[in-house]
UniProtKB/Swiss-Prot annotation:
PANTHER family, sorted: ABC TRANSPORTER ABCH.3
Cofactor(s) the record lists: Zn(2+)
Domain Zinc-hook: 380-478
Residue ranges of coiled coil: 176-319, 376-413, 440-697
Assembly with partners or alone: Homodimer. Forms a heterotetramer composed of two Mre11 subunits and two Rad50 subunits.
Task of the protein: Part of the Rad50/Mre11 complex, which is involved in the early steps of DNA double-strand break (DSB) repair. The complex may facilitate opening of the processed DNA ends to aid in the recruitment of HerA and NurA. Rad50 controls the balance between DNA end bridging and DNA resection via ATP-dependent structural rearrangements of the Rad50/Mre11 complex.
Source species of the chain: Saccharolobus solfataricus (strain ATCC 35092 / DSM 1617 / JCM 11322 / P2)
GO MF entries: ATP binding; ATP hydrolysis activity; DNA exonuclease activity; zinc ion binding
Note on cofactor: Binds 1 zinc ion per homodimer.
Record remark on domains: The two conserved Cys that bind zinc constitute the zinc-hook, which separates the large intramolecular coiled coil regions. The 2 Cys residues coordinate one molecule of zinc with the help of the 2 Cys residues of the zinc-hook of another Rad50 molecule, thereby forming a V-shaped homodimer.
The protein's name in its UniProt record: DNA double-strand break repair Rad50 ATPase
């Protein structure tokens, strides 16, 4: 799998860069700080989502909110696209042959490892060589191999503080816990047996009590039946005797009442004879009363006749006056009608006059405004030219200020980068950079910044002055422009207003006669108004109403004559009678009549009481017979009641004892159930004892198998041979005096450190040399060959090799040697990517990518 292309969007100094790797040896060349290594950072971030820049936000280009990297890889079968979003892990995607197969950071990383067979630790230690780390693999060979082969992880597993020992300790703690559980298990078994024995004892007591309760309930039932029968008799006896006493009392009371009523009704016949005369006397009294009513009606009727005669006289007088006023009333109504007809035109006339006054006032104001505005019109054109010239000056000053600020920002960034440099090597170009040189660069930059700041202050002051002047001119220009528009508007309004005023004059002239006519009519109405109001007051007096009153007067006179005739008839009938003596006699008879009515009522009550006495005497006789039949004995009743209460008390005591036993039984059974559940739970836990013992033994065997003499030795042995074969095969393709190389990889010791191990080199002349005896060029060649050999052995699907600034610290001779090695290495790896600032390395390339920085952005161009 080779790298085809990478796209960087807002990544470090790259805003949007698309880099294609079309050759076997691809060289990325550019000045220090141009953004070359950022491309390698992008490849590493795409593959493993890792970097050495601290927080992920540090990868996003300054001034941007988001950033992303897309890496394209391919082989004969597949095309892979890896998309990484710098800020959001959920947006990461993996696309295979244009089909999405994974999403989110972790899933994408796992899938990349499966498909490409790339392990992060191996890749970063072998095929991706960071700046200054080319021969680090020779210096730290044992440590790097331990990391690559995961020997450190195996050692951590079997360490005395590792997870295997920790897990074994946990299992041993569980065994000790099971010993404690077994002791509790035996104690609980003993307790449950004791409780079960107590349950059996209580159940026997309960059965005995249930038999006793059953016998008692039977005895109580027998006595209760007898008592209920006697209770029934007693209730019947008490009911009858109570009723008998009540009836005897009622009988005695009735006899006393009968005797009293007989005395009170002795003179009833005599009273009836006297009262028969009362009706005749009453009729005479009614005639006296009727005469009084007729006399009163006669008096009232006479007064009404006199009043009605006066009213008729007034009516006749009012009607005559009404007839005199009617012509003036009709004249008044006619004038009112005429006023109503003229009113719309008169209102129109008033409205037109009001409109004319308003428009004349408006015209006066507009003429005044037009006079004032005409003075500002000539100034607009000259101000317009002045605004344009001042704006150009402002834009020029802003451009100069932006340029100065950009230069200040660049110098501050240089100072910041120099201040953060650790050691005496420039991180950008790799050249020597001692403290004196650093301070000199910083001093020069600060001096330049000071000069720029002074320039900036002058520009800002001048810009502020120009801006204030422009604002002032623009405000005046806007005011005058608005005044010109206002002047035009005022003139249009005046023209329209003059036309409207002329029209209003014409309309008012046509309606002028209406005003005079209205005034004349109002004067006539004023003269007739009093006559009109008097006529309206007399309008209620009509001839029809007068005729009705005359008819009514005739009827009243006729009625008066009838009353006089009836009064004369009654006077002849009542002649010689004394009304007061008559009324006294009637009153006495009325009192006797009331007394007679009371006697009649008492007579009826007396007869009813006599009937009730007969009935009560019969009831008393029957009740006495029923009492004799019952034969109730109070002593026998009390004897049965006492016996029943005693048996019920005994039954209640036994039932209480039974309830207490049942409560204790329920509690015991609940305890037994809970303890049995705990026993069953303990039995399940105790079954695990054998499994735990077996697990402890197996853990010891696993720990032993993972030790340095077993699994580690096996991994080293199988890997070592494969790497050596690959290494010697690659070296044979280089033009070196090395015949063969052997490696010694040692397992991790129990103390967590690697045992001694080494790389031995056999020369063509038969000598055996350690690494330290090799020349600089041979060390470079061996480092590259060893990295490729390890990668080929452990990552069979990886076909690229990346070198970041491999020429750093190399002299010209070694650089030339490195170029030859890179050319030779392409026989072992199909794709090599080299990042460098040395133009000499371009000689080895068949595809060149140039990177340069403009301002704070990196730009890429490709050369074939």
């Amino acid at each position: 799998m080779r790298i085809d292309k990478i796209t960087l969007t807002n990544f470090l100094s790259h805003e949007h860069s698309e880099i294609q790797f079309m050759g076997e040896i691809n060289v990325i060349v550019g000045q220090n700080g141009a953004g070359k290594s950022s491309i390698i950072d992008g490849i590493v971030f795409s593959l493993f989502r890792t970097h050495s820049r601290g927080n992920n936000d540090n990868l996003i280009r300054k001034g941007s909110n988001r950033g992303s990297v897309t890496l394209y890889l391919s082989n004969e079968k597949d095309k892979i696209e890896i998309i990484r979003d710098i800020r959001s892990t959920t947006e990461d995607r993996l696309i295979r042959n244009q089909f999405p197969i994974a999403r989110s950071a972790t899933v994408v990383s796992n899938e990349i490892e499966k498909i490409l067979g790339i392990d992060k630790d191996i890749a970063l230690s072998t095929i991706i060589v960071r700046q200054g780390e080319l021969d680090k693999i020779l210096e730290n060979f044992q440590e790097i191999m331990g990391k690559i082969l995961k020997l450190e992880l195996i050692e951590k597993l079997i360490d005395s503080r590792g997870p295997i020992v920790e897990f074994r300790k946990n299992l041993e703690n569980k065994l000790r816990e099971l010993d404690r559980i077994e002791q509790d298990y035996n104690n609980f078994k003993k307790t449950v047996e004791e409780k079960r024995a107590r349950v059996l004892e209580l159940k026997k007591d309960k059965e005995k009590l249930e038999d006793e309760i059953k016998n008692l309930e039977k005895r109580i039932k027998d006595i209760k039946d007898q008592f209920d029968e006697y209770e029934k008799k007693r209730n019947q006896y008490l009911k009858l005797t109570t009723t008998l006493k009540i009836k005897e009392g009622e009988l005695n009371e009735l006899n006393r009442s009968i005797e009293e009523l007989r005395k009170q009704t002795e003179n009833m016949d005599q009273l009836e004879k006297e009262i028969n005369e009362l009706e005749n006397l009453r009729n005479i009294k009614l005639k006296f009363e009727k005469y009084e009513v007729l006399a009163k009606s006669h008096t009232e009727m006479s007064a009404n006749v006199i009043n009605l005669e006066k009213e008729i006289e007034e009516y006749e007088k009012a009607i005559r006056r009404k007839e005199e006023l009617e012509p003036k009333y009709l004249k008044y109504k006619e004038l009112e009608r005429k006023l109503e007809e003229l009113q719309p035109k008169y209102q129109q006339y008033l409205k037109l006059k009001s409109d004319l006054d308003s428009k004349l006032n408006l015209k006066e104001r507009l003429e005044k405004d037009a006079s004032e505005l005409s003075n500002d019109i000539d100034k607009v054109n000259s101000l317009e030219q002045k605004v344009e010239e001042t704006r150009k000056k402002q834009l020029n000053l802003r451009a100069q200020l932006a340029k100065v600020e950009s230069l200040i920002s660049e110098k501050n960034e240089i100072i910041n980068n120099i201040s953060q440099v650790e050691g005496e090597t420039c991180p950008v170009c790799g050249r020597p950079l001692d403290e004196e040189h650093k301070q000199k660069i910083i001093k020069e930059a600060k001096s330049y910044i000071l000069q720029l700041e002074l320039n900036k202050n002058e520009l800002e002051e001048e810009l502020k002055k120009i801006t204030n002047e422009l604002n002032k001119i623009e405000r005046e220009y806007r005011r005058l422009s608005n005044n010109k528009a206002s002047y035009d508007n005022v003139m249009r309004q005046l023209k329209k207003l003059n036309e409207e005023i002329e029209n209003l004059h014409s309309e008012i002239e046509s309606l002028k006669n209406i005003d005079e006519e209205i005034k004349k009519i109002n004067e006539e109405v004023k003269e007739l108004k009093l006559y009109y109001e008097e006529f309206m007051r007399l309008s209620k007096y009509t001839k029809e109403e007068l005729d009705k009153k005359r008819v009514k007067l005739d009827e009243m006179k006729k009625k008066k004559e009838e009353i006089e005739k009836e009064m004369r008839g009654l006077e002849s009938e009542l002649k010689g009678l004394d009304r007061k003596a008559l009324e006294s006699k009637i009153l006495d008879l009325e009192n006797k009549r009331v007394k007679l009515d009371e006697m009649k009522k008492k007579k009826g009550i007396l007869e009813d009481y006599i009937r009730q006495v007969k009935l009560l005497q019969e009831e008393v006789k029957n009740l006495r017979e029923e009492v004799n039949i019952i034969q109730f004995d109070e002593n026998r009743y009390n004897e049965l009641k006492t016996s029943l209460d005693a048996y019920n008390l005994s039954l209640k005591e036994k039932e209480n004892r039974k309830s207490r036993i049942e409560g204790e039984l329920e509690s015991l059974e609940k305890d037994i159930e809970e303890i049995s559940n705990r026993i069953a739970n303990y039995e399940l836990q105790l079954k695990d004892r054998e499994k735990i013992i077996n697990a402890i033994n197996k853990l010891e065997k696993i720990r032993s198998a993972l030790g340095e003499r077993k699994l580690q030795s096996y991994i080293i042995m199988t890997t070592k041979q494969l790497i050596e074969n690959n290494l010697n095969d690659i070296i044979s393709k280089f033009d070196l005096s090395i015949k063969n190389v052997e490696m010694e990889i040692m397992p991790k010791t129990g103390r967590g450190r690697s045992s001694s191990g080494d790389i031995l080199v056999y020369t063509n002349s038969g000598d055996t040399l350690p690494i330290v005896s090799l020349s600089g060029g041979e060390r470079i060649a061996l480092s590259i060959a060893l990295r490729l050999a390890i990668a080929k052995a452990l990552m069979s699907n990886t076909n690229f090799f990346i070198l970041d600034e491999p020429t750093i610290h190399l002299d010209d001779q070694r650089k030339a040697y490195l170029i030859e090695i890179i050319r030779a290495a392409k026989e072992s790896v199909p794709q090599i990517i080299v990042v460098t600032h040395d133009e000499e390395v371009v000689q080895a390339a068949d595809y060149v990518i140039r990177v340069e920085k403009r301002g704070n952005k990196s730009f890429v161009r490709e050369e074939t």
